[in-house]
């Protein structure tokens, strides 16, 4: 059976590792890769969508990155226990007209014994920003290790 370490029960350090792995995966914007960290029958609430299973999650992510261009994400630990992690995040993107946004949100994750995510509940709000207000300027892909996190940026 496939495992995705770190495995529950989580410590503060392993929760932070799991979060950074998720951030890196989402910053790849590769739905084929991303869905592999979820159970086959994963259940999500993402904004006003409720996908079930990897295929529906893949479709959601594909649509997401067709709309949210030049996507850059930072996640940060909020809380953890046994097999659950709470995360806060922000990401910046622009639409096809060039309008920039910073999206703020919270996620609640639950993992199975193999470290695959069973449940993901996400609440997200979009804030229209000027390009000059952007704070996430690294090259597309993984956030550099020396780039400030959300708290460091005052977010």
Regions found by a protein language model. Give the residues of each.
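Short, low-complexity N-terminal intrinsically disordered segments enriched in polar/charged residues
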Residues: 1-40, 150-155
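A beta-strand edge to alpha-helix "cap/lid" segment located at domain peripheries
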Residues: 2-10, 59-155
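Bulky hydrophobic/aromatic packing residues
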Residues: 14, 18, 26, 38, ...
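Secondary-structure boundary/capping residues
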Residues: 31, 43, 70-74
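Short secondary-structure capping/turn micro-motifs that flank functional sites
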Residues: 42-43, 126
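Short solvent-exposed beta->alpha transition segments
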Residues: 43-65
């Amino acid at each position: 059976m496939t495992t995705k370490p770190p495995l529950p029960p989580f410590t503060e350090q392993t929760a932070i590792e799991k979060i950074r792995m998720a951030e890196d995966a989402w910053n790849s914007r590769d739905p084929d890769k991303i869905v592999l960290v979820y159970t086959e029958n994963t259940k999500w609430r993402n904004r006003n969508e409720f996908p079930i299973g990897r295929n529906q999650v893949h479709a959601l992510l594909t649509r997401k990155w067709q709309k949210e261009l030049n996507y850059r994400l930072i996640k940060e630990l909020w809380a953890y226990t046994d097999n659950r992690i709470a995360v806060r995040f922000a990401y910046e993107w622009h639409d096809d007209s060039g309008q920039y946004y910073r999206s703020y949100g919270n996620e609640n994750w639950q993992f199975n014994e193999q470290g695959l995510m069973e449940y993901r509940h996400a609440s997200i709000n979009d804030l229209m920003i000027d390009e000059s207000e952007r704070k996430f300027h690294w090259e597309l892909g993984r956030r550099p290790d020396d780039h400030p996190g959300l708290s460091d940026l005052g977010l």
